[in-house]
Amino acid sequence: MTGDLSKTIYLTMDTDWAGDDVLSDSLTLIDELQVPVTIFITHETKLLETIRDHPLIRLGIHPNFYPLLQNHADQDYLSVIGEIKKIVPEAVSARSHGLIDSTAILEAFKAQGITRDLNLFIPFSSGIELKPFRHFCGLLRIPYFYEDDAYCSENSGKTACEHILSSGDGLKVFNFHPIHLFLNTENMNRYLDAKPFQREYSQLIKHVNRNQQIGARAFLKQVVECGRENYFAFDHVENL
């Protein structure tokens, strides 16, 4: 484990089947901010090689086990993990879609070469100081305290700087989604209204929140600004 947890910020992103226009927007934002990000991949995309070759990006897997829970699956959990690992064979980090978790899933992650999992979301509002810890199967579990959609639903009003400066010596891991960065989502109604148009860029862009002070995109920029102003480092979760 490297770095000082009290002075390091970790940024992550779940692609969640975002269209290429939306993914491209996130890549442009990463270039603008010049910060390291781990992106958890859900699907094949023509942008995958561009993402893979980006010097600021590392790739993780984001398997979807929901069809298993809904009895709509034509494969088991091992196959789900195996298929997404074929797309991102180099991945050593994993976060399940919807944070679906079990000992069996963690053990399967490890068997596929995963060393770190990020399935534990404990919001900043809990007041709990987060630390990475070793699961008995051998994985390093890395809890995180911010997720853009959960932040919209919780409506706590806590600022980016409060997350960073009031979390003491604890982990500071943030998670975003390309669609919410694109829309600058400030409430889930905006996302739900835009959701039918995720593959129709000309319609989707009409749903963007243009307020530069409030929303997921604004929050990410504020995280980076506050971190730099207060001399925090930025690093990949793979370096924990």
Which residues does each predicted region cover?
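Structural motif
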Residues: 40, 96-97
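Substrate-binding cleft of extracellular glycoside hydrolase catalytic domains
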Residues: 53-80, 93, 99
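Acidic beta-strand-to-loop metal/phosphate-binding motif
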Residues: 95-96, 175
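Terminal accessory/targeting
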Residues: 1-54, 86-90, 103-115, 120-240
